[in-house]
Amino acid sequence: MARYTGPATRVSRRLRVDLVGGDMAFERRPYPPGQAGRNRIKESEYLLQLQEKQKAKYTYGVLERQFRRYYAEANRLPGKTGDNLVVLLESRLDNVIYRAGLANTRRQARQLVSHGHFTVNGKKINVPSFRVTQYDIIDVRERSQKMEWFEEAQDRLVDANVPAWLQVVPDTLRILVHQLPERAQIDVPLQEQLIVELYSK
């Protein structure tokens, strides 16, 4: 299965959630394409569970096989499987770059990571799914700091709304991972228990 690269608004409308953040087109028409919006069709329990899984996959840019691996690992970890799943997804390097304010969207963050603009603990990482851990230090590579995007980022980061589990140093474009997030700190509108119910069948 190839990664979806089409209009994000269309997917947002189908799943009834803004997957991008600040999507004005979605806000104008927050109902599925072709439905003319207003009347919601009664949905089965299975469809609701499936939609929640799709929402998680599209939000974090994860394909089906990879998502199954995330779920399997979440199920092995102590604690609630649903909470574990969301924390694993939130710990992806591309998501951390997005959360820190160095990218406007997760899709853009994925591209920046893939192009090799970041190091983690001094080592170049170009895998968006790389999992960060507590006390990791993420830096923009020295040669990448000369890019216009990153030069302008220093000003943007001063007022960036960064999650409490991260710290950003604007002058050096450094991200410090103080801890892994708890589910309560993750503002993604997911009902992860529906995903657990789907995979438990």
UniProtKB/Swiss-Prot annotation:
CDD domains: S4. It holds the Pfam family Ribosomal_S4. InterPro entries: Ribosomal_uS4, Ribosomal_uS4_bac-type, Ribosomal_uS4_CS, Ribosomal_uS4_N, S4_RNA-bd, S4_RNA-bd_sf. The keyword Ribosomal protein applies. One of its GO terms (cellular component) is small ribosomal subunit. GO terms for biological process: ribosomal small subunit biogenesis; translation. Residues 91-154 form the S4 RNA-binding domain. It comes from the Bacteria. One of its GO terms (molecular function) is rRNA binding. Keywords: Ribonucleoprotein, Ribosomal protein, RNA-binding, rRNA-binding. One of the primary rRNA binding proteins, it binds directly to 16S rRNA where it nucleates assembly of the body of the 30S subunit. With S5 and S12 plays an important role in translational accuracy. Belongs to the universal ribosomal protein uS4 family. HAMAP family: Ribosomal_uS4_B. Part of the 30S ribosomal subunit. Contacts protein S5. The interaction surface between S4 and S5 is involved in control of translational fidelity. This is Small ribosomal subunit protein uS4. It comes from Corynebacterium aurimucosum (strain ATCC 700975 / DSM 44827 / CIP 107346 / CN-1).
